[in-house]
Curated annotation (Swiss-Prot):
Gene Ontology cellular-component annotations: nucleus
Name the UniProt record assigns to this protein: LIM/homeobox protein Lhx9
Ranges of Low complexity composition bias in the record: 353-365
Annotated keywords: DNA-binding, Homeobox, LIM domain, Metal-binding, Nucleus, Repeat, Zinc
GO molecular function: DNA-binding transcription factor activity, RNA polymerase II-specific; metal ion binding; sequence-specific double-stranded DNA binding
Cross-referenced Pfam families: Homeodomain (PF00046), LIM (PF00412)
Transmembrane segments: none
Tissue/organ expression: Expressed in the dorsal thalamus and inner nuclei of the cerebellum.
Subunit relationships: Interacts with LDB1 and LDB2.
LIM zinc-binding domain ranges (all copies): 69-130, 131-193
Compartment(s): Nucleus
Organism whose genome encodes this protein: Mus musculus (Mouse)
Biased composition (Polar residues): 387-397
Length: 397
């Protein structure tokens, strides 16, 4: 049986299926198929009407036809079917961008707003979620190396003197005033009232509560002790003064200034004492070699427990005293300080150590009653015609 069409009931859907040809199907089955097709067409019509509203998706907020929405980015009307809603504002898909890197945020999961500006995640955390450099006021990421001074943090390139822009590194001395960093030279000038012109030394002292401002080093802590001094005629103070009046029964000392800044401030002294066995070891070696090298200083440091710097200073002052006493001996023949005869310096040809074949005797140099007699070879006598064959080292120190 061939069916070309079917008759529609009154008040039924105006759907008209095209002419179809059915073979081997009874009339009852054909009628059921047509009714099912009409039911499905009505359901699809209701879904289409519910999902379309003014030509837009129902999931988006409805736009009033009287007052169309304006894009918060470009300010134009939104006539697209899809738009974005961020911080209670409507945006074109192409207009929601990061204000820093211009990255389109339509496909991003998150965006951030600050003072009316839109940021992506990276720029927001870079600018607002980390500490800022005290010099350039830009963000510092967690992976960057920084310099710290008091409560401030600086980029490595921003930690410079506010006057000469000299880059300050770890270990350099610097001063701070009103969150400004100065190198040592300009900070000393600032203390003396010569720089800057609008800030006098009296005002600086009144603001800081004293006449001196602290120094800092590159580690970000206040320099409590005396910083290592550079040779400057303005300071006029020796780094280390050897106590030349010491004897065997008194410990030697190294005098150091505590704080030389400013010059008008009263200085404090920190004294380094030597024990008797340390003095004996140093004096015994001084009798052999007046100028020990780095290897000898290392061995002496292990024996005495002193630092190489302290040993260098002691030998430096001992050589100076030896030369001074030698000049006194040449002029008067007798050291006026203790009234004892002094030995001549070792010959340059003899080397640092006693030559082979020379009988050398080292005893306790701290005992004033024992003398050390050294027999000098004939070549040394020819090089030093005025030097005696016997020298007394007991009262040298």
């Amino acid at each position: 049986m061939e069916i070309v069409g079917c008759r529609a009931e009154n008040n039924s859907c105006p759907f008209r299926p095209p002419a179809m040809l059915f073979h081997g199907i009874s009339g009852g089955h054909i009628q059921g198929i047509m009714e099912e097709m009409e039911r499905r067409s009505k359901t699809e019509a209701r879904l289409t009407k519910g999902t379309q509203l003014n030509g837009r998706d129902a999931g988006m907020p409805p736009l009033s036809p009287e007052k169309p929405a304006l894009c918060a980015g470009c300010g134009g009307k939104i006539s697209d079917r899809y738009y974005l809603l961020a911080v209670d504002k409507q945006w074109h898909l192409r207009c929601l961008k990061c204000c820093e890197c211009k990255l389109a945020l339509e496909s991003e999961l998150t965006c951030f707003a600050k003072d009316g500006s839109i940021y992506c995640k990276e720029d927001y955390y870079r600018r607002f979620s980390v500490q800022r450099c005290a010099r350039c006021h830009l963000g510092i990421s967690a992976s960057e190396m920084v310099m710290r001074a008091r409560d401030s943090v600086y980029h490595l390139s921003c930690f410079t003197c506010s006057t000469c822009n000299k880059t300050l590194t770890t270990g350099d001395h610097f001063g701070m005033k009103d969150s400004l960093v100065y190198c040592r030279a300009h900070f000393e000038t600032l203390l003396q009232g010569e720089y800057p012109p609008q800030l006098s030394y009296t005002e600086l002292a009144a603001k800081s509560g004293g006449l001196a401002l602290p120094y800092f080093n590159g580690t970000g802590t206040v320099q409590k002790g005396r910083p290592r001094k550079r040779k400057s005629p303005a300071l006029g103070v020796d780094i280390v003064n050897y106590n030349s009046g010491c004897n065997e029964n008194e410990a030697d000392h190294l005098d150091r200034d505590q704080q030389p800044y400013p010059p008008s401030q009263k200085t404090k002294r920190m004294r380094t004492s030597f024990k008797h066995h340390q003095l004996r070891t140093m004096k015994s070696y001084f009798a052999i070699n007046h100028n020990p090298d780095a290897k000898d200083l290392k061995q002496l440091a292990q024996k005495t427990g002193l630092t190489k710097r302290v040993l260098q200073v002691w030998f430096q002052n001992a050589r100076a005293k030896f030369r001074r006493n030698l000049l006194r001996q040449e002029n008067g023949g007798v050291d006026k300080a203790d009234g004892t005869s002094l030995p001549a310096p070792p010959s340059a040809d003899s080397g640092a150590l006693t030559p082979p074949g020379t009988a050398t005797t080292l005893t306790d140099l701290t005992n004033p009653t024992v003398t050390v007699v050294t027999t000098v070879t004939s070549n040394m006598d020819s090089h030093e015609p005025g030097s005696p064959s016997q020298t007394t080292l007991t009262n040298l120190f």
